[in-house]
Each structure stands twice: as C-alpha cells, then as structure tokens.
Amino acid sequence: MNEKNILERNINYSNAYGRNLLQEAIVSCENAIAVDLVNKGIDIDHQDKMGWTPLHFCAQYNNITIAELLLQEGAKVNIIDCYGNNPLWYAVFNANDDYCLVKLLVKYGADALSKNNAMRSPLDFAKQIEDTEMINILANKNLISKYQSKK
C-alpha cells in the first residue's frame, strides 16, 4: 500500500495528544500541507485531548492564512477547550499589536464575552492589559451584535 492510500484511509488519524494531521501541520507551520488536508476533507473542528481545534492552534500561532481557510470552510468559531477558552481568547492573548486574526474571528462571530472557567472573557483580558485598540475591536463587535438582535 502506498503513502497516498494510507493518508486517504486515515485522514482523521490522531496521535497520542489527540491531535489530527491538520493540527500538527498548523503547529509545524506547514500551510501547504494544511490546505491539502482541508481540501481532502479532514475534520476541521477536531478537538485534541485539551479540547483545542485547528482554529485554536491558528490563534495560538497567529496563522491567519489557515484560520481564514478554516472559517471559509465552516469551522465553528466558538468551540471551547478544557479551560473554557474559545479561539478568540488565544488570538487576543497572542496578538502583540497585530489585530488581524482577532478581527477575522470577530467577523465570523467569535464571542468576545464568552466566559472561561476562570469567569473571564477575551474582552475582560483586553481591559486588564489596557489594550485600547483591542477593547474597541471586541466592544464594537458586541455593540453591533446587540443592535442587530434588537431589529
């Protein structure tokens, strides 16, 4: 049996950490492999043993290219991990003045008010670190959502 047949039969294989091939490709910064796996139909919402999805890894490693692909393919933006954190939490925490991934997640409906196991939200964290631009991105998203739900 050749390598291609093995990959096609086991595309959703997960390792000892519960990570699938897509998650490992993201961690390894192998975008071409990640794109190929998505195109082959890998589970884009697979959760590892810590509850991380491929989108969590994109947020952790600030990989906007694959995050955008996953969101366009319908990845669930608000899945929480074992700590109650959605991918937006990691994007906010790792932004370092680069707000592109945060804006992308917000555009696709990430919940900036989602409380984790410590009862803190991404917006709470932005306020704690006094990141005015981040606060504006997250707060404006929630104001728009509240306005639209009242229509």
Predicted regions and their residues:
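Intrinsically disordered, low-complexity regulatory segments in ankyrin-centric signaling systems
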Residues: 1-28, 35, 39, 144-151
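Ankyrin-repeat-protein effector appendages
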Residues: 2-5, 9, 108, 117-120, ...
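Ankyrin repeat domain, specifically the short helix-to-loop turn at the C-terminus of the second helix
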Residues: 5-9, 35-43, 68-76, 103-111, ...
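Ankyrin repeat boundary signal
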Residues: 13-14, 44-47, 79-80, 112-115, ...
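Ankyrin repeat A-helix N-terminal signature
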Residues: 24-29, 57-63, 90-98, 125-130
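Alpha-helical adaptor scaffolds
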Residues: 27, 49-52, 56-61, 65-76, ...
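Conserved ankyrin/ankyrin-like repeat signature
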Residues: 32-33, 65-66, 100-101, 133-134
